């Protein structure tokens, strides 16, 4: 059962790990015909030598790339949200049990699958995530500048653009409450803010360019 799979395999579940993959295959009767641990480099080689079948995986890191590769080999690769797979887990959790749950889940007619992303779609997703992180960093810097000013009794009206426009004047004229060390600190933060603005603007342009004419994901 663990190494031999003379029976025709109808469906396979793959539990994706960083370096190893746990694979469980069922025959047409639902009996386990394959139960093996493969290295990352073995996955495509092994599956290239097997008849086309249904293959399920959780939609985790690396799953979209592998799904595309397995589809090129002729397999019907499908991705599922991990939360929907959990309902099919049996017994104590381990990697092979996870693969068993995946192969059970992928055969369910009511399963809600995740569309396999193209390379461009993954690039677009990455750009959005990086931009979101930079926007969050910028917000943190702006809040810190406001907090430092308020601690010294200097209030600036709300709004990113307002603070950007008024900050140079505040630093130049409020030397009565802003000592030189604090002015330098805020000027350094303002420099970080400007650099983040430039990076965010550049990423926004990349996102707009890549998003134009983006093909729909395959299901």
Regions found by a protein language model. Give the residues of each.
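A detector of single, family-specific signature residues
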Residues: 1-219
């Amino acid at each position: 059962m663990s190494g031999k799979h003379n029976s025709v395999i109808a469906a396979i579940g793959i539990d994706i790990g960083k370096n190893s993959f746990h694979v469980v295959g069922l025959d047409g009767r639902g009996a386990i015909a394959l139960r093996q641990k493969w290295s990352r480099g073995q996955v495509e080689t092994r599956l290239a030598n097997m008849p086309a079948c249904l293959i399920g995986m959780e939609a985790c890191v690396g799953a979209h790339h592998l799904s595309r590769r397995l589809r090129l080999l002729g397999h019907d690769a499908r991705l599922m949200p991990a939360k929907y797979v959990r309902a099919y887990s049996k017994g104590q959790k381990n990697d092979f049990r996870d693969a068993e749950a995946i192969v059970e889940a992928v055969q369910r007619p009511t399963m809600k699958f995740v569309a396999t992303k193209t390379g461009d779609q993954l690039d677009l997703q990455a750009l959005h995530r990086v931009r979101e992180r930079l926007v969050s960093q910028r917000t943190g810097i702006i809040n810190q500048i406001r907090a430092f000013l308020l601690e010294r009794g200097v209030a600036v009206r709300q709004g990113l653009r307002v603070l950007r426009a008024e900050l140079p004047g505040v630093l130049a004229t409020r030397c009565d409450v802003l000592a030189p060390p604090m002015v330098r600190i805020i000027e350094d933060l303002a420099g970080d803010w400007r650099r983040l603005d430039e990076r965010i603007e550049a990423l926004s342009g990349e996102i707009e360019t890549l998003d134009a004419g983006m093909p729909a994901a395959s299901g």
